[in-house]
């Protein structure tokens, strides 16, 4: 079966447009969790630690859901919610394991649960958020159309 080269280029550009923000944000999470911490200096921040995990992974979940829902990959597009929750939770697990090897950091099951909750919250609310943010969706469509023309 012959494939259309223009369509392949378009699919690659589309994949970059949607997956690059998710990959970049995952790299940011990794970089932040690589920083050694002094627990005494972070006393006040630790009170909000779980909310920070929830928010951090909610953003990742939204970016993953956006990428999977528009990927054009049948397995991902068929169930982007499940793919988002699975991928985000596995990434959270890998991040917690990574933190076990960083001075001043510890791996925490509670943190992992808040990571998974954040990703799940994003996946479950994504359709509503996309509906409510119609102007954002319209802007994304214009940008994607411009990228496709190049």
Which stretches of residues belong to each language-model region?
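Membrane-interfacial, low-structure loops and terminal tails that flank and connect transmembrane helices
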Residues: 1-12, 134-150
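"…centered on the first transmembrane helix and the immediately adjacent amphipathic helix/loop
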Residues: 2-67
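Alpha-helical transmembrane segments of integral membrane proteins
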Residues: 13, 17-21, 52, 79-83, ...
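Small-polar-interrupted transmembrane alpha-helices in polytopic inner-membrane proteins
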Residues: 22-33, 81-100
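Interfacial helix-loop-helix junctions of multi-pass membrane proteins
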Residues: 40-46, 92-116
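Membrane-interfacial alpha-helical segments at the cytosolic side of multi-pass membrane proteins
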Residues: 55-71, 119-131
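Membrane-interfacial segments
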Residues: 68-76, 98-102, 106, 129, ...
């Amino acid at each position: 079966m012959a494939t259309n080269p223009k369509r392949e280029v378009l699919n690659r550009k589309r994949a970059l447009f949607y997956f690059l923000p998710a990959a970049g944000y995952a790299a940011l999470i990794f970089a932040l969790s690589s920083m050694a911490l002094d627990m005494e200096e972070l006393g006040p921040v630790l009170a909000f630690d779980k909310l920070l995990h929830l928010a951090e992974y909610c953003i990742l979940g939204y970016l993953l859901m956006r990428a999977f829902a528009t990927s054009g990959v049948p397995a991902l597009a068929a169930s982007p919610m499940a793919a988002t929750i699975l991928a985000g939770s596995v990434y959270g697990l890998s991040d917690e394991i990574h933190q076990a090897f960083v001075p001043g950091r510890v791996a925490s099951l509670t943190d992992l649960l808040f990571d998974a909750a954040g990703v799940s919250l994003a996946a479950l609310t994504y359709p509503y958020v996309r509906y409510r943010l119609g102007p954002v969706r319209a802007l994304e469509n214009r940008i994607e159309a411009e990228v496709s023309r190049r």
